[in-house]
């Protein structure tokens, strides 16, 4: 019996923005609930946090090269809501949009199909302060058809 994956099979990797990007206070990014949680004494072993993580924000080109070198053809990553819309709603941060645009372009340049997760448990702290997901208005913001009102 011969086992073979189809030619269009996606071999890839997956990450989450808080767990990989670092640069939690760079280029207009605001705090997420994970920033607050990991900076609360006693919540995380050794007081570790994602402030630097593996610094994907600054090293994404090298990371994508490594993916290409091992013949991955897909990359699932999440967008940090706090990097794109720092206050959770309203003004869009051009530097955040630019980062993800460059990341996607690099993936495509290396024939790596980007798969995007819009939310990976990193609610902006400003929205958590208003009740988080228990606040119906925040749930409605997330599903809003207006790009300025959603992540």
Q: What residue spans do the PLM features occupy?
A:
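Flexible loop/turn segments at secondary-structure boundaries
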Residues: 19-21, 84-86, 123
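The substrate-binding groove and active-site-proximal loops of carbohydrate-active enzymes
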Residues: 45-55, 82-97, 127-140
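Aromatic-lined substrate-binding rim segments of carbohydrate-active enzymes
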Residues: 64-70, 75-119
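Active-site groove signature of glycoside hydrolases
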Residues: 119-128, 144
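Glycine-rich, aromatic-flanked loop segments that form ligand/cofactor-binding clefts
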Residues: 9-20, 108-121
């Amino acid at each position: 019996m011969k086992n073979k994956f189809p030619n269009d099979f996606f071999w890839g990797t997956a990450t989450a923005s808080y767990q990989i990007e670092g640069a939690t206070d760079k280029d207009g990014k605001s705090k997420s609930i994970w920033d607050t949680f990991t900076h609360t004494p006693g919540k995380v072993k050794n007081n570790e946090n994602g402030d630097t993580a593996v610094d994907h924000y600054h090293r994404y080109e090298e990371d994508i090269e490594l993916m290409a070198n091992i013949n991955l053809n897909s990359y699932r990553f999440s967008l940090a809501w706090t990097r794109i819309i720092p206050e959770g709603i309203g003004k869009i941060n051009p530097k955040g949009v630019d980062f993800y645009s460059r990341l996607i372009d690099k993936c495509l340049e290396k024939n790596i199909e980007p798969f995007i997760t819009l939310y990976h448990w990193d609610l902006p702290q400003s929205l958590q302060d208003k009740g988080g997901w228990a606040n119906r208005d925040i749930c409605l913001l997330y599903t809003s058809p207006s790009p300025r009102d959603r992540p």
